[in-house]
């Protein structure tokens, strides 16, 4: 899984080096990034299906590909942070998660090839950055000390009004709110203690699958905003933080 992420990321890193030259043409840059996204997913599909021929594959670009082994599914986002990539902002990631029937997500990888931050997790064994650094959520207990990450609904996405209400409720109580543009990295950064919490609505399973397990294995809590844990991997509307901050943030979001 890690090697597949690295190989797909190598192609993205090469393509990222060319993006700046295309900024003169919005359409040119957009088409280039779309092709980079598709190429990265094709690389992941080929490598993962070769390694585990029977497993299913759910990718952002190709959708669901059924496997003969109905108990295992790869969940893949080849390029989370597409808009950042298109604007030559070095904050994006390749994401792979493995879902097992009856157990949920059992392993995952989130990799930013530009910073070489490789976050990985295995159920029951912990979450890590690189080879050795164990991830733990931040220990802050008070909202006025906390920095939160979120995602802002953009063109064509629903929920602008609700987001502004939530931002109003949350921002009055916290030390800061950040919007970096890649949900998978936001979750990894919460797991690593860089951010204290992350919330966002209208996500997809490939945005969050690896991050869900990272939060859990780093001692954090992740639920949907309505606290229905059973469908948190489906993305939708999630809140991730440490155990102490979670109810405090949830209270602010529900007041919106």
Curated annotation (Swiss-Prot):
Mg(2+) 2 binds at residues 77, 80, 207. Its EC number is 3.1.3.25. Its cofactor is Mg(2+). It is an enzyme of class 3 (hydrolase). One of its GO terms (molecular function) is inositol monophosphate 1-phosphatase activity. The keyword Magnesium applies. Mg(2+) 1 binds at residues 60, 77, 79. Keywords: Hydrolase, Magnesium, Metal-binding. Belongs to the inositol monophosphatase superfamily. This is Inositol-1-monophosphatase. It comes from Caulobacter vibrioides (strain ATCC 19089 / CIP 103742 / CB 15) (Caulobacter crescentus).
